[in-house]
Amino acid sequence: MKTSQWIDISQPLNNDIATWPGDTPFSYEVSWSKENSGSVNVGKLTMSIHTGTHIDAPFHFDNDGKKVLDLDIQVYVGPARIIDVSNLESIGKKELENFHLEGVERLLLRTSSHGKANEFPDVIPHLRADIAAFLSEKGIRLIGVDVPSVDPLDDKELAAHHQLFKHGIHILENVVLDHVVDGDYELIALPLALTDADGSPVRAVIRPI
């Protein structure tokens, strides 16, 4: 039996990728070339943790919150379900009630609202705070979205961020889902082992189950 191929659902990181307005631009350069070193090329990377496909740790929005290395890495590996929630301004309990989510631990939402990694969106569909308790009741431990944030871009309260982690639900942002169909997959989206960080870039991949 042929094993299903892994599918990349990450935004490629390059010097053209969009960043949050005012945040650190992404930059990669060869700072020590083979010609200079005599043996190797050595690259230098500068970026915000919240550029491209990434996870949030509670420390991102709570000074007393857990940091990346405190998070349970088991959450970022395992079965996941992709569902389509396109053409919605916001997503909460009401919009998900008709989906079969029993037994789902990781849920990825396709909004198809913004597919340009090199342009930061002006507005995005966001999650309403009431989604957190609903997802928790279903046993979901991770929510993934194909936009830069689970909250509105100009929001300062970050109600969805706070409520999701209050209910034990981890956040994965900026996944790329327009090239995959709805259904069940195995997900790997492991954060780097960053001791004091408020988030981490990830290489998110899926394969059909």
Swiss-Prot record:
Pathway: Amino-acid degradation; L-tryptophan degradation via kynurenine pathway; L-kynurenine from L-tryptophan: step 2/2. GO terms for biological process: anthranilate metabolic process; L-tryptophan catabolic process to kynurenine. The active site is at H60. Keywords: Hydrolase, Metal-binding, Tryptophan catabolism, Zinc. Pfam families: Cyclase (PF04199). Zn(2+) 1 binds at H50, H54, D56, E173. GO terms for molecular function: arylformamidase activity; formamidase activity; zinc ion binding. Its cofactor is Zn(2+). Homodimer. Belongs to the Cyclase 1 superfamily. KynB family. NCBIfam families: trp_arylform. This is Kynurenine formamidase. It comes from Bacillus mycoides (strain KBAB4). The lineage of its organism: Bacteria, Bacillati, Bacillota, Bacilli, Bacillales.
